[in-house]
């Protein structure tokens, strides 16, 4: 739990500029809820996945000024994670990997939505 809180505080310290619709509390709750849902009770997994979610959110915030449409950016981001993570995963782990990518893309989309 402490690692997750440290990661969330790290998000705030990176000067994330969330819009009025998305507060830091909402982001932190989303990251904690999603990491707990994906990893179950494994705290190490939760901390690692929460960090990936925060990075995905920050990537979305950085890309929000891109000249590309959101759909194009989301497809590229999903393809990147599918290539990095799911192409090397064993066959039995493919479904879990695709679930992870979906959650990362959702976090990226939340970052993009701060336009």
Swiss-Prot record:
Function: Binds to the host (E.coli) valyl--tRNA ligase and thereby changes several of its physicochemical properties.
Listed name of the protein: Valyl--tRNA ligase modifier
Top-rank taxon, per record: Viruses
Organism: Enterobacteria phage T4
